[in-house]
Amino acid sequence: MRRNVEVFINNQRVDLFDFEDINIVDSVQDVRDIAKIFVPYSREFTVPASKNNNKIFKHYYNNDIVNGFDARFKISAVIKVNGMVYKNGRVTLLNSSLKNNRPVNYKLVFYSKTIDFKTLLSDDLLEDMDTSILSKFNIEYNAQNVFDGFNYGYSLIGENIVANDVPVENSDLIIPFISTNSHYYYDDNVAGISPLEGDSESRNVNFNGGVAYPNNVVSGVNWKDLRPSLKLPILMQAIEEKYGISFVSDFFTTDAFNKLYIWLNNDKGLYGEERTVGTDFSEFTLDNGNDERPITTTSSVFYRLLLTVNIDDVNDDYELNVTNNNDSKTIYTSTAKGTNTFEIPLLFRGGGIYIYDLNFEITGVESNSITLSAKLELFSNGLQSTSNYSFVDAATDGVFNIRKNMPKVKVIDFLTGLFKMFNLTAYVNDDDNIVVDTLDDYYRKGSTVDITRFTKNEESTVSRNKLYSQIDFMFEEPKTFATINSNELSRDEFGNERIDNTNNDPELSALLAFDGGKYEVAPKFEKMQYERMTDQSNPTLLQNFCWGWCVTDDQKATLTKPILHYTENVDVDVIPLTVQMGFDPTTGQANIPVSYYFRPSNSLSTSTTLGQSLHFGSEEDEFYTSLGSNETSLFNMYWKNTILAIYDEKSRITTYKANLPISIANTIKLNDVVVVNRKKYRINKIDINITTGDANLELVTYRKLVRYNGFTVDNDGFTVDSTLITVDKTI
């Protein structure tokens, strides 16, 4: 029996063909592509070119109509079945068919309610989010304010950011012990020799009772080495504000997320001293003229760029490097002092066209105030047009602008990275909120639906999963000293994990049906390894000081991909290590004592308990090494069920045909457990004809979700053949 299906577009009822079926395909996460999120959509369907529909689609077939139907945009739509709302979403008009120059029909596709993040976020960077919430955390960057943030952190009270005067767990803004330039160590002997050989300045953090070191040796933590970290939930609030969206998530209330911080550093070296200012031309503001970006040259079209570097110190010397992001070629280099204008030719370099995506890097500057202005001249048989652009550096006026100091990453890549780390999935609820869950928790919230009597058992197919021969869980290539050297010494990759299903055995690889190839889960974040200090005079004695060093393996200041971290506000004078840390507020010799400081951490471990780590693989906590390897990894906590379900020997993909009643078709959810003939399945995909109720179901063998508890996993009788799936720590 055919059901009464209605389609409404912008609250207008669409005329339908009596014979036309509408099929909805629904899948949340395909087991054959473990990091791809799907959105319910319809197969193409046609509606008549009736008088009513012509009015709705504004005679789309006639492109002479002014202000006609704009098919570039999806239009709000609702599908009802027998008077009940089935799906809310949007419709895309694909085309209009004509016969003898008269309209016959319109072809449509329906998409369920969702958020098109790629369109919404476009190519926006985190630093593009000019929001009120982020502006509240801008602070004057000076020795006192840095000391306050390093000691106890800042909290948002009302509309104001206020320095805490006592330790506050999970402060909104902190300044962790991550150095952008200097090397740090502890030595009880203040006349001792630095343990480091190289160009970097080494500083002993021993407070030494506030007494200056002999021979005027600098010591203590230099405030200009430090940058703030912002609590990640605040950044998520900024994304909500910027794009008019709302996240609802139990996961966002967990410590694993709520205690995350993002390090705010997009400048090399000391703050305000010998720093690097880097920016892309795409980040300049167009002041007047036509926007010629991207700059496209041909054999008859070229450009000239007049770049003016405005610096407030006439004696500040620096080097300018201009490169093309498209091919990494150097376009222009020059050295100068003070304010200067540079003439940069942008000529055709062969091929049909040559496109310039310019990056400017100014190194060695000390000035706080730097602005760039650019005049772009277009030539084609002479000068044709001129456009003017400008850029203001983040450090202007001595204010640390939170937004402008965000790591250089697209908003979409930042969110995608979070989803990959914690195996998250998302959907839009009836209140237009974006519900975010870990995939495991999403499935745990489902119900059980028995559809046995509605299935056509004579028509079913059982097949196997496509298997990956190797799955790599990996962060970006490390750029920092400790991580690079650790990887070389251990022949391991810090924080990464590899699932190697061949055990590096060519014969086994030839026998097993690994037809899924290799797969990567690769968030665009970087891992930094931290170091707990020992006493250089007594290397067996650990100190309460743990820090990170943002320099390359040859000790040069560097920029990293985004770094996420946890933190612990450490009492530096705790028994038995009654040693105080010195803080240098003047870049001189006399220090002030630090009571507490924020140590950066890759886990939520405490002195007695290993907590959630930010590694895919098992690693020791750099501060609490005595606790041993931390198995509370991203893989164990968020990915293990997904992977084991794929490689379970009993795992099958079973397809059934069914005719689902309205009561089930309108309410079944993708996280429901489906029962057929007393066997449980998870839903991989549903393709349902909502007009007739006929459905094709692609189901995956049900496997009970297990929770990771400390060092053991209850697999409920499930075993993994060690020759089939192994964890390789040597990638």
Where are the predicted features?
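Viral virion structural and adsorption modules
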Residues: 706-731
